[in-house]
Structures are given as C-alpha cells and as structure tokens.
UniProtKB/Swiss-Prot annotation:
Source taxon at top rank: Bacteria
SUPFAM superfamilies: Homeodomain-like (SSF46689)
Gene Ontology terms describing biological process: regulation of DNA-templated transcription
One Pfam family of this chain: HTH_8
Gene that encodes it: fis
Assembly and binders: Homodimer.
Protein name per the record: DNA-binding protein Fis
InterPro entries listed in its UniProt record: Fis_DNA-bd, Homeodomain-like_sf, HTH_Fis, Trans_regulatory_Fis
GO MF term set: sequence-specific DNA binding
Native source organism of the sequence: Klebsiella pneumoniae
Function (record text): Activates ribosomal RNA transcription. Plays a direct role in upstream activation of rRNA promoters.
Protein keywords: Activator, DNA-binding, Transcription, Transcription regulation
Family: Belongs to the transcriptional regulatory Fis family.
DNA-binding region: 74-93
Amino acid sequence: MFEQRVNSDVLTVSTVNSQDQVTQKPLRDSVKQALKNYFAQLNGQDVNDLYELVLAEVEQPLLDMVMQYTRGNQTRAALMMGINRGTLRKKLK
C-alpha cells in the first residue's frame, strides 16, 4: 500500500511492511530505487532517452492526480503545478 503526502514541501511515500508497520521515505528515494532496479535489469545494455522515459513515467500520474484533486479545474491545476494553463491543456491531450 502506498500513500503520498506533502511534508515541508517534500513528497513522501508511506509503505506498510509485513508486520503492519508504516514507514515513510521521500519520493526521491523510491525513484532512486526504481532506477537502480531498472539498471540492474539492463545487464549492461545501452539506454537512450532515459530522461524522457522517467519524465513520462512521473508526469502522467502527476497530471491524473492533480486533475482529480482539483476536480477537473484546469486553472487551479495549472496554478498548483506552477505551469501555464495552455501548457497543462497540451499535456492533458
């Protein structure tokens, strides 16, 4: 089970282990671990466009959750994300 919270402008991920203990760590740690796993699976193969791959993996869930949180209000969502509303509209297409 994962849960995201904002604490002092740092996104954290809460996880529940097998003993039902909740632990929190910064989202960046989860991203770092996911990248370590990704590199381990590559077995030395070259990668192209890793930056774009990571952004695409993060951007869509971000857009989905912000739009859900703002109940579809694109102006409010754009303000929350710190981007222009037109830019948000393009990303939502």
